[in-house]
Amino acid sequence: MILKRVTEALEAYKNGEMLIVMDDEDRENEGDLVLAGIFSTPEKINFMATHARGLICVSLTKDLAKKFELPPMVSVNDSNHETAFTVSIDAKEARTGISAFERHLTIELLCKDTTKPSDFVRPGHIFPLIAKDGGVLARTGHTEASVDLCKLAGLKPVSVICEIMKEDGSMARRGDKFLSDFALKHNLKTLYVSDLISYRLENESLLKMFCQEEREFLKHQTQCYTFLDHQQKNHYAFKFKGAKTHDLAPLVRFHPIKEDFDFLTTDAFEVFFKALEYLKHEGGYLIFMNTHSKENNVVKDFGIGALVLKNLGIKDFRLLSSCEDRQYKALSGFGLKLVETISL
């Protein structure tokens, strides 16, 4: 079923059709209208503005953002999902920049190889978003999903995305009859971010285990697994054996590092050692993610942690967390199930 949905969606995307992409209920829980940038027309942009009603944005890769000299909109991103907005832009030729034709003109420029940074003015009425390297396997957002769709379809990695809102101005949520009726009315295919995650996991890998060895860690004997990701960064998993080891749903603690084992300089020194005591007693996995995230932002890079768990053959797990309401997104796409959260 998932393969069929993704295959049909990719075929539609290649042919210039719009799709509805939905994320998990525990994330933004919304449906976005997405379109490959190279198929943008004034009519399609007008359709998004008229029927989807959300903010029209353009998702693209970090390399393209760099090429067009699009810096982050803010120096500190503290939005709920850390959506990577750049400065907004208009085509230099545009007058007001807001008409469907002029917004299309700006999008068209983002898709051309010959476009220069000077072809845009800032700020404007198109809002570029930078997709995270690794796509939905690194961050489970609409931004990454729409760029992944372009890459999988063999198209330039620029997508137009727009949130779908109801007529009363409220968000159309996953599970709403509104979204299914919207898809039926406009003959649009629907895809889930978790579908893309599953599809990519079946066809590629961002993470490979290259070392497994017995290693002493803070005076405790562990099994150490070392992984290499697509950016040539190392990530580590230490397996602890405890008196109450739960093999079916092991304890897991995710921890960010800035360099190899540079955990002592993180913001969570006390929490780290509290988690360590749990693992020594009950057994489980301590996973170091080389993501340069702060402790309170580790969820942003959960994709890497999920890939580590998948490589270790773990399906169900219990999470050691310093924040009970922290939400880990699109777990089903990784074949994972969080059965319990233990507060530190």
From Swiss-Prot:
Residues where D-ribulose 5-phosphate binds: R27, E28, D32, R139, T140, G141, H142, T143, E163
Family: In the N-terminal section; belongs to the DHBP synthase family. In the C-terminal section; belongs to the GTP cyclohydrolase II family.
Protein name, as recorded: 3,4-dihydroxy-2-butanone 4-phosphate synthase
Enzyme Commission number(s) of this protein: 4.1.99.12
One Gene Ontology term of the molecular function aspect: manganese ion binding
The record's free-text note on cofactor binding: Binds 2 divalent metal cations per subunit. Magnesium or manganese.
Region of interest (DHBP synthase), ranges: 1-202
Substrates-to-products reaction catalysed: D-ribulose 5-phosphate = (2S)-2-hydroxy-3-oxobutyl phosphate + formate + H(+)
Annotated site (Essential for catalytic activity): H125, E163
Cofactors (names): Mg(2+); Mn(2+)
Pathway(s) this gene product operates in, as recorded in its UniProt entry: Cofactor biosynthesis; riboflavin biosynthesis; 2-hydroxy-3-oxobutyl phosphate from D-ribulose 5-phosphate: step 1/1
Binding positions for Mg(2+) 1 per the UniProt entry: E28
Taxonomic path: Bacteria, Pseudomonadati, Campylobacterota, Epsilonproteobacteria, Campylobacterales
SUPFAM superfamilies recorded: RibA-like, YrdC/RibB
Organism for this UniProt entry: Helicobacter pylori (strain ATCC 700392 / 26695)
Stated role: Catalyzes the conversion of D-ribulose 5-phosphate to formate and 3,4-dihydroxy-2-butanone 4-phosphate.
A single cellular component GO annotation: cytosol
Keyword Metal-binding part of the UniProt annotation: yes
Keywords per UniProt: Lyase, Magnesium, Manganese, Metal-binding, Riboflavin biosynthesis
One Pfam family cited in the UniProt record for this chain: GTP_cyclohydro2
